[in-house]
């Protein structure tokens, strides 16, 4: 049986150097003899302290490229600016940015480049190469033609500093919008530069939905299903939709026509026989009231040609004891202009209601 050997000096040093603080304290508690504790403590003083493992802190996300910074990095290469130091060009670049009509495009380009840089690194995503590719595609003016295209003239003021003034006579001074008329997204820009050979190691995220309306419409599953059904039956979708709308419109028109035809006049009589007599009575009452109001200025008892009376001796519709004498049925004196307000209105207790 092999006898246990004592560890070497190097093995002991390696063992102690790889222990944690809690393990070192546990070893010290196991040593009972004071001399051994002293020797062990002295040995520990010659080693570097072993720190407890700390959780790995994830690296902070890099700051996204600002749209103005990208604009400045691209147009600082304007040939007329090369003879001036950067501190004299800051105000000029700010003025150009304030009047530039393509700020929205620069925001999209800055966001697209930031996404590429965060994945592949800055070394694999040179900014100048990115702008050379995408600005040419978007038909943005290059640094050499920017001032002339937007009607700017670089002059030197009395203090010897560069100054930009607008050329009123220049036809290009009225440029106020981008030359491109497309609905772009960040993903569209990334896809174009990758197809041009920029940042080939970048892996796009296929789960990201395009924020543009055209991108959402093209990726819509419902639209794909409708198109597949239309192709299967070889039937234009627009024709089917028009036929359905026409049928619904026809049904609405028929319903309106039927509802209008059902209204034939006033409420029917109890025996559901529409008799012209009741219409005549209604007209006589209305005309009589209007005539009495018109004749209010005459004295009471004056015989007028418009004083209408219905013959009370004739019965109508077989109703028993039905007599009509409109002047005696209602006393309108109370309603005359300046009439007697104390007039007594007739009582109707003796009238039988059917």
From Swiss-Prot:
Cellular compartment(s): Nucleus
Q: Which residues bind DNA?
A: 60-117
**Where does the UniProt annotation place the signal sequence?**
none
GO biological-process terms attached to the record? positive regulation of mating-type specific transcription, DNA-templated; single fertilization
As one GO molecular function, the record gives: DNA binding, bending
Record InterPro entries: MATalpha_HMGbox (IPR006856)
Q: Ubl conjugation as a keyword?
A: no
Family matches, as PROSITE patterns: ALPHA_BOX (PS51325)
* Assigned keywords, A-Z: DNA-binding, Fertilization, Nucleus, Transcription, Transcription regulation
Give a Gene Ontology cellular component term annotated to this protein. nucleus
| Job description of the protein | Mating type proteins are sequence specific DNA-binding proteins that act as master switches in fungal differentiation by controlling gene expression in a cell type-specific fashion. Transcriptional activator that induces the transcription of alpha-specific genes.
Protein family (similarity comment): Belongs to the MATALPHA1 family.
- What's the protein name? Mating-type protein MAT-1
Report which gene this protein is encoded by.
MAT1
